[in-house]
């Protein structure tokens, strides 16, 4: 598949989305499928992916589910090769798998630091390295990484903020290395998005999900929190050829929160 075969959307492409069983990843998988892409729905537990795969197939789309620990080199390589074999290649990768283990520095364990780093940074590295083997020979590909506004620093998130800042550095570096092969690498940095992850954060600090969302909306210029679909649509744009001259960028999708 070469650039002349591509449209302005992800139609007719094969997309891998990690962390796709729920939240932003699930919305992204559904968005790609709605545009005609064949989607590999990856998450730690394959059974968790069944719901999204079922929705895609019920709508007439093509999707497969794969269980994969993105921090495990052998699992990542095997998963990417399986996608390429079953779906006919790999055109798009969305590195979205993530986890939080929030705490203040003096309370944060080395294990919680390592877990967050491994899932976010090691995972994005391993998945990107695996897909480039399929993208470089055909001189075409799109890699979109999920960063966060927390990359700018956030109390109680030394591990997460550092990992998300690292994602931005990885994005720029891969854009330099892979650009000569017509592979675009970009990142999105979501603000507060209403997901199970942010609901869990609310519970951890003793707030209801609704109260936490209301507080976040108050300090957001657009006066609302984001939905997973807000991010999915931006990811789909970056994966399409309308963004073919965009690479190495981090797009903040935060309702103006960073202003």
Model-found features: residue ranges?
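Substrate-binding pocket helix/loop in short-chain dehydrogenase/reductase
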Residues: 104-105, 112-114, 143, 212, ...
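The beta1-alpha1 cofactor-binding region of Rossmann-like NAD(H)/NADP(H)-dependent oxidoreductases
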Residues: 46-47, 67-78, 110, 230
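Alpha-helical segment proximal to the catalytic Tyr-Lys
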Residues: 133, 176-180, 244
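Short, flexible catalytic-loop segment of classical short-chain dehydrogenase/reductase
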Residues: 190-200, 204
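Active-site loop-to-helix junction immediately N-terminal to the catalytic Tyr of the SDR YXXXK motif
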Residues: 108, 154-162, 173
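C-terminal substrate-recognition "lid" of short-chain dehydrogenase/reductases
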Residues: 125-128, 140, 222-253, 258
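Active-site helix of classical SDR
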Residues: 128, 163, 171
């Amino acid at each position: 598949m070469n650039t002349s075969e591509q449209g302005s959307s992800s139609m007719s492409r094969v997309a891998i989305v990690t962390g796709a069983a729920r939240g932003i990843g699930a919305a992204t998988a559904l968005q790609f499928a709605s545009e005609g892409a064949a989607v590999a729905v990856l998450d730690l537990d394959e059974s968790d992916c069944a719901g999204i795969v079922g929705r895609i197939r019920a709508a007439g789309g093509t999707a497969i589910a794969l269980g994969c620990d993105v921090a495990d080199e052998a699992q990542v390589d095997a998963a990417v090769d399986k996608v390429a074999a079953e779906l006919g290649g790999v055109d798009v990768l969305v590195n979205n798998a993530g986890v939080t283990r929030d705490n203040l520095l003096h309370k944060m364990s080395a294990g919680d630091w390592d877990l967050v780093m491994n899932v976010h940074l090691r995972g994005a590295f391993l998945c990107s390295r695996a897909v480039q083997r399929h993208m470089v020979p055909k001189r075409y590909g799109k890699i979109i990484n999920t960063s966060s506004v927390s990359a700018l620093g956030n109390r109680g998130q030394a591990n997460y903020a550092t990992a998300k800042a690292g994602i931005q550095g990885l994005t720029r570096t891969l854009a330099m290395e892979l650009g000569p092969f017509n592979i675009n690498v970009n990142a999105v940095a979501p603000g507060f998005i209403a997901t199970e992850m942010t609901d869990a954060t609310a519970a951890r600090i003793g707030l209801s999900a609704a109260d936490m969302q209301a507080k976040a909306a108050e300090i957001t210029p657009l006066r609302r929190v984001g939905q997973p679909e807000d991010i999915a649509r931006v990811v789909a744009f970056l994966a399409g050829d309308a963004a073919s001259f965009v690479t190495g960028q981090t797009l903040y999708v935060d309702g103006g929160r960073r202003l």
